[in-house]
Structures are given as C-alpha cells and as structure tokens.
Amino acid sequence: MIPVVQGGMGVGVSASRLSSAVARENGVGTIASVDLRHLHDDLLAESKINPSEEKYTQLNCTALDREIQKTKADANGKGMIAVNVMKAVKDHAAYVRQACESGADAIVMGAGLPLDLPEMTEGYHKDVALFPILSESRGIGIVLKRWMKKGVLPDAIVIEHPAHAAGHLGAASVAGVNDAKFEFKRVIEETFEVFKNLGLESEKIPLILAGGMANFEKVKTALKNWGASAVQIGTAFAVTEEGDAHINFKKTLAGAETEHVVEFMSVAGLPARGVRTKFLDNYIKRESKLQANAKADPRRCTQGLNCLTSCGLRDGLAKARQ
C-alpha cells in the first residue's frame, strides 16, 4: 500500500472510476456516498416517479452498491476501497450500512462528530475499517473516549486542516478556519499525548493528514517530520482524467487561481471552501440579505429532499447558507 488516501468528493466527483484507479495503484480509493443516483440515468428517472424521501434513500443506496461493486471489479483486488459518508446527511446511517453490506473496505466519516459510527457498523468491525475525520485533538479525544466504551478503536484518524482543505471544514465558523489549534504539527503532538493519556500508545493508530497536500515536499514533511502515516489528497485527484466529475467542473477547478478560492458557510451549517464561480459569486453578494430573511419552512427547498439533519434553508438558520 502506498501512503495516499484519495479524499471523498461529492456529488459524483469521486465514484467508481476515480476510486478504482487509485486502488489499482495500491492507494485508498474513496467513493463519496452523497446522492449517487445522479450518476445512473435509470435511477434518476425512477426518482422522479412518485418521489419521496424514502425512495431517494433507497435509490441512493442502490447507486452506492453499484459503485462499490464496479470499483471492486475494476480495482483488480488491489489497494483499499473506502466510502465517505457525511454525518450531516440525514440518512447517513443507511449509507454506512449499505457500504458495509456491499463490501467496502473502510468507512470514512466527517462533516460532524462520528460518535456513533461503531453502532452503525455493528457486525462489521472485523471486516470494515473505520476512519473518522477530525480537525483538532479535543475532538479526537472525545471520539476515542466514546468509541472505547463500545470496545472499538479507529483503524486510522484523518486530521483535516480547515485552512487548507476543500469542501466542508471542521471549524465553527469561516473566521475560525485559520485558528492555530488546527496546525498539523500541533495537532499530531497533542494527539500522541491523547493516546498516551488513554493508554493507546501501543495501538499505533495511524494518522492521515488532509488539506493542502499538493506537492511532494508537503507530503514528505508530513510523513518524515511530523509522524503522519499517510496523506489524504482530494482536489488534485478531482481534476484528473479518471475523475468522475463533468469536464466543465474539472476545467473550472483546474483553472482556478488562488484568488478565486473563497470560504463561505454551507447550507449544512459548516464552513466550506470552493471556487468562486458566477453562481457562487451571485449568492455571496446576496448572502447577508438572504440570511436576514431566514425562516424555518420546509417548502423553501424546491427539491423537497430533506437531505440534511440540519439545513440552513429549511430550518431558517441565519448563520448557514440559504
């Protein structure tokens, strides 16, 4: 195995094509579980017939199973196949169970504290590795203590730096992503101290650094100087030929300059980072007004998906995206 984990990227950015390509090189290929029905024309068509939340979940589980089976077939028995599940998604438990039943090698969970991941994977602990995504040592300690009560330990911990990663970020606010408590070297040192205090030093739980691992020097520093066991890389894989995203998405991402990257609050109530496209720019210009008029109303979501546990638009959360 090479010490590289391909980050999970949705919707449909990392599915079977990308994850199998990474696995074939003896890395960890990761399928993003969110709303995979969009990659399957028959499932997308079916979802428009008498739509319901339950039907969307069922169809997404079917799509997830298809993606896992195709990844396994195309990986030729090499590497590992992981499934990324967002805790913020309402039906996260269903996707975790489907991933386990479909034969995924690992579950990676972020976008919220994965405190109950051991319960969700009951019966599969010998077969499926568990990788929580966290950003600082306090959260790592909380998760470890909770999991230890269930007799379960993480098979690895992904430490994601909110100032450098893309997608949803593990900070309380946009302003907080640059807090010194998230610095990799500090978090690793503090995490080793947490291991010591909990009597886990001998377990040698691998730490995987995620965020900004964009060149060899950064990877080498993480592995050689800081004590990380591997790195997680997302954006660099997203724009590859093997990536599952639309070509226009890849061109936009690959062509973005540093000044085009912007932080904002996602509809899930978490800080996020992305490219300032025309669509996002129009939203950001109107954000203050939209947030000032936030109100709880399930009808405000035109798709009626009810897909998130907490939704800025549906629940009228003024600090989240509308």
Show the residue positions of the predicted features.
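Conserved active-site-proximal phosphate/metal-binding subdomains
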Residues: 5, 154, 164-184, 188-204, ...
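Residue-level detector of alpha-helix initiation sites
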Residues: 13, 213-214
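Active-site entrance/lid segments in N-terminal catalytic domains of soluble metabolic enzymes
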Residues: 1-201
